[in-house]
């Protein structure tokens, strides 16, 4: 007897604001939901005691899941082997008689396995590879907002190289780790600006270069989406260059000041 996961919705993780400067504000990136961490499946063939089999009442073919709620039911249109869903077909989940998740694709021993499409009640969907009941392999998650995440998935989570595209066309290409943008990556803005560098838990952190559409640029250290540490801002309309230590997006040198990822008010300059 093997285990298949029930409905597993993606949740909003955080907002990822863009850096800002004194000469020209940068638009907010908006929310970038990243799939939440999913529970680990038991080893196939060794289900926990609190597992239940959910059967199609018309065919008797079923799947097995952990801690199934009493009001869950399914409808399976494909083949059945040893009373478990097998091969290509459509698996429709119901909760209290109301349709919820819908899976169209390949099954093996009652588990999502191979190519498939999983559609959620909020109209979000995942299309790609599954393994042992999890999103595993190459796939694309499409959010209700129209945002898209295309990546390598491992045990249900984006892991490795991938691309996230916001509804407004801004896009991130780079590393994902532990369900977050972590590692090296690039954000490309629709206005022609870009950031290339390091990320930690979805934020610009480490060394990186931010270039604005008007030619201004900051190159140096970042923390929490702000210039923090040693860095240089240059290329503004007035031609000034600011080199030195930055703190929480703020820089002051005698009578001059500048911001990257902060506002003049938050830095106490106004």
Please tell me what each predicted stretch does.
Residues 5-6, 17-270:
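Intrinsically disordered, low-complexity repeat tracts enriched in Gly/Pro/Ser/Thr and acidic residues
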């Amino acid at each position: 007897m093997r285990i298949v996961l029930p409905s597993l919705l993606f949740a909003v993780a955080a907002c990822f604001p863009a850096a800002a400067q004194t000469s020209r504000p940068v638009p907010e990136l908006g929310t970038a939901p990243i799939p939440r961490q999913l529970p680990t499946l038991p080893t196939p063939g060794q289900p926990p005691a609190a597992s239940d089999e959910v059967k199609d009442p018309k065919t008797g073919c079923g799947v097995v899941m952990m801690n199934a709620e009493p009001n869950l039911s399914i409808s399976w249109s494909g083949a059945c082997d040893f009373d478990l869903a097998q091969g290509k077909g459509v698996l429709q989940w119901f909760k209290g008689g109301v349709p919820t998740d819908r899976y169209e694709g390949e099954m093996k021993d009652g588990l999502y396995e191979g190519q498939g499409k999983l559609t959620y009640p909020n109209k979000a969907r995942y299309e790609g590879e599954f393994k042992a009941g999890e999103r595993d392999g190459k796939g694309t998650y499409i959010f209700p907002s129209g945002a898209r995440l295309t990546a390598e998935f491992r045990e249900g989570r984006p892991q490795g190289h991938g691309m996230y595209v916001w509804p407004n066309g801004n896009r991130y290409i780079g590393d994902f780790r532990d369900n977050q943008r972590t590692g090296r990556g690039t954000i490309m803005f629709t206005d022609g600006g870009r950031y290339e560098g390091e990320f930690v838990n979805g934020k610009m952190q480490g060394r990186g270069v931010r270039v604005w559409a008007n030619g201004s640029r900051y190159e140096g250290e970042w923390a929490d989406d702000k210039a923090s540490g040693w860095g240089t801002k240059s290329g503004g309309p007035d031609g000034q260059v600011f080199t030195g230590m930055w703190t929480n997006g703020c820089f002051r040198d005698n009578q001059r000041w500048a911001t990257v990822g902060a506002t003049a008010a938050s830095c106490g300059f106004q």
